[in-house]
């Protein structure tokens, strides 16, 4: 029953055969399909390259003709035009300034001329002459003979002036009195004495030196302006001790060299003297 149904159905089972035959026919008529497609692809690529080259040429031409293009002779020409334009503008401005100055000068000249015309010219007045009376000739007094009475009066005149001598003596006495008072006042005024505080290091010969005797020798030095202070024994090493003693001296009377000379005179006990500290008071 199924086969009978298929026998009555209208189905084209051989259609693929006809399609293959038609394809082969057209292939033979138009040539191979692969070669044709390759040619079309090559032509399209060439056309695209040509179009791209045209676009690039147009863009380059448009860029060179634009205002921002400064490379090449075209750019130099545009820069030159800009500079010329700026120079022309500056020239016009300078011309305007010059014209303003000329107008101001002309106004000043007109003002001066008007002032000169309005003010009258002063007339030169001659100075008034003073009438001077003629000088009279003065006759010298006639010398008269001196009488004996006048000669006696001239002899009685004290030419040296005893009054002036008394005044000079009084002035000298006052001057001496003032000098004496000034000297007394200056003597009563206390004078500042420059003093210094010195710390001395007195070193013995060895550890067997009697340090008490050494200190006694040092303190036995008595000078004007020298005052001895506190002292102590400072260990040096190997059982040896040095005498460290303080003193105050007046700078004008006692010096460090004098102190060293006086202390080093005790050769049996003293080896050397050093200044450990020196301060102004």
UniProtKB/Swiss-Prot annotation:
Q: Where is this region: Leucine-zipper?
A: 80-115
**KW Ubl conjugation (keyword) present:** no
Query: Residues bearing Phosphothreonine?
Result: 129, 147
Biased composition (Acidic residues) is annotated at 149-169
Polar residues biased stretches: 115-132
Modification N6-succinyllysine occurs at: 117
**Where are the Phosphoserine residues found in this chain?**
37, 44, 60, 86, 106, 119, 133, 162
GO-annotated molecular function: DNA binding; translation elongation factor activity
Q: Which residues carry this modification: N6-acetyllysine?
A: 17, 107, 117
Keywords from the named record:
Acetylation, DNA-binding, Elongation factor, Nucleus, Phosphoprotein, Protein biosynthesis, Transcription, Transcription regulation
Task: Spell out the InterPro entries in the cross-references.
Answer: eEF-1beta-like_sf (IPR036219), EF-1_beta_acid_region_euk (IPR018940), EF1B_bsu/dsu (IPR049720), EF1B_bsu/dsu_GNE (IPR014038), Transl_elong_EF1B/ribsomal_bS6 (IPR014717), Transl_elong_EF1B_B/D_CS (IPR001326)
Tell me the leader sequence span.
none
Q: Which Pfam families does this chain map to?
A: EF-1_beta_acid (PF10587), EF1_GNE (PF00736)
What GO terms fall under cellular component here? cytoplasm; eukaryotic translation elongation factor 1 complex; glutamatergic synapse; nucleus; synapse
Region Disordered: start-end pairs: 113-172
Q: Where is this region: Catalytic (GEF)?
A: 173-281
| Residues carrying N-acetylalanine | 2
Its assembly, as annotated, is: EF-1 is composed of 4 subunits: alpha, beta, delta isoform 1, and gamma. Isoform 3 interacts with HSF1 and NFE2L2.
Protein family per UniProt:
Belongs to the EF-1-beta/EF-1-delta family.
What is the protein name for this chain? Elongation factor 1-delta
Q: Which organism is it from?
A: Mus musculus (Mouse)
Q: Which gene encodes it?
A: Eef1d
